[in-house]
Amino acid sequence: VGRIGSFGRATVALLLALLALGATAAPAGAAPKVLVVGDSLEELTSPYLSRYLPGAELVINAVGGSNSYQIFDLFQESYEPSDSVIVFDAGTNDNPEYPQILAGNLAKVAAAVGNRCMVVPTIHGFTVNGVDNTGKNRAVAEFAASRPGTQVPDWAGTVESSPQLLQSDGLHPIPEGAELRAQLIAQGVEGCLAYEQARTTAPAQPRTNVEPIATVGRLQARQAAVMGELQTDLLRQAAVLLAGSLLGR
């Protein structure tokens, strides 16, 4: 009985080894890291973000009164290569007569983060010397058009249609407005994460003059041959164990 038990345990071990050859371990997915930088609007918005992004690791660096130059500095202070999404909530305190300031700072962030996805809300700010925020929002739209995947939560359009979401100063949101703004930004973050998932899992485009089907076929044949060799070796070991078990009776 002892010899049979020993052989049984060896056989089970070999079978488990065979099964393990075809198994792949999927690492547990880490929570996506989201960096959020901004001004006083973001200070009011950010307390609600975790409610709508419960699975994300949020890093928030927002300082009231900051223009886009200063918010770029906040970005530089906080950015890590492990960040998955960058929310650049800037432009409200920029002079609307010079939309190129925001455009330049957006370009600097993009240069620093590579192909990481960005969320850039549209801007509702004060009119200065008769100039409104059209130029700044055009800069945001042009930036998004030049960079696939960029998400643009429409805060400007939201408060234009629902001005009751703003405080009496006509600039900062009331609590209900701040929560809605957080929802818009969270939707942008989710859009970024979905875009990144689609981008990283999309099949590579075949190169010119390459026969991808034949290449895949040869690879599969080689993998099958290697698997067969390994399985044959393991079965040979099982046969040796069986022979030893029988001879030892």
Language model features with spans:
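Bacterial N-terminal signal peptides that target proteins for export
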Residues: V1-V12
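Bacterial N-terminal signal peptides
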Residues: T11-A23
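Bacterial Sec-dependent signal peptides at the C-terminal "C-region" and cleavage site
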Residues: G22-A30
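Conserved SGNH/GDSL esterase-like catalytic core that processes O-acyl groups on lipids
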Residues: A30-N105, T127-G135
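Alpha/beta-hydrolase-fold catalytic nucleophile elbow
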Residues: D89, P121-T122
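Generic structural signal for well-ordered alpha-helices
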Residues: A103-A110, N137, A141
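A short helix->loop->beta-strand "cap" motif at the edges of active sites that frequently abuts
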Residues: G114-M118
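Catalytic His-Asp segment of secreted/periplasmic serine-dependent ester chemistry enzymes
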Residues: F126-Q223, A239-G248
